[in-house]
Amino acid sequence: MKIKGNNVLITGGASGIGKIMGRMALEKGAKALIIWDVNQEALEATAAEFASRGRVYIYKVDITNSQLVAQTYQQIKDECGSVDILINCAGIVRGNKTFDQQTEQDIRLTFEVNTIAPMIITKEILPDMLRRNSGHICNIASAGGMLSTPKMSVYAASKWAAIGWSDSVRIELQEMKSNVHVTTIAPYFINTGMFNGVKSPLLPIQQPEPTARKIIRAIERNRTFRGIPFGFHFIRFWQAILPIRVFDFVFGTVFGIYHAMDNFTGRTK
């Protein structure tokens, strides 16, 4: 779907890759950029930075609060008009702990932000897209949603669920012959601060600018799925043909993915 002339809503859009995609959307002529984030200071700084690039609307939203999501979406419709492109980008990770060390609070929060919130937001916005028979939903999942990864089991589970939901909605819309499209993105670790401390001996940590560019391009081309880097498109193929122990050796030992989180620290603020 074209970015130019359309309203783009990005959750988690005041920092990291969400912020970069917002800038790119404005550069491509988005009618308005709508940013949801929980960090008021970052929202205001982003709005000031982007002010000369186009129309920017900022909203402080706790996306785990379904009532606030509904209220804010109504406010958007009153102030900005329709949401043509929704990018569910907000996410959290609680890593460097084995599952037995995870707290119930961390488990619930991870699923509320990474899995349930995109569903609630999409459920709020999708009916209007269906009525217009136009729109695009892009869900930022993770390569961790295709690979079992020690010390981030809860995060991986939340992203496995996100991928299953996102692609199922895509098929539902396809069978409805709707002109609303869904793109699922599964990137490897991205160097935005969210995964500080992660080590990847053979597979390169992805850089934010080219990653954001690939996501925007996937939206514009109505791609159904985009692994980043491209080789992650073949993960399921290798899982299907390799014995589990061989797969574990190749991806866990040779590529070092199973130990990527050993020194994880994440964002410090």
Where are these regions (language model features)?
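Substrate-binding pocket helix/loop in short-chain dehydrogenase/reductase
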Residues: 97-99, 103-108
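Active-site helix of classical SDR
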Residues: 122, 158
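The beta1-alpha1 cofactor-binding region of Rossmann-like NAD(H)/NADP(H)-dependent oxidoreductases
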Residues: 40-41, 60-71, 104
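Conserved glycine-rich Rossmann-like NAD(P)H-binding loop of the short-chain dehydrogenase/reductase
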Residues: 30-46
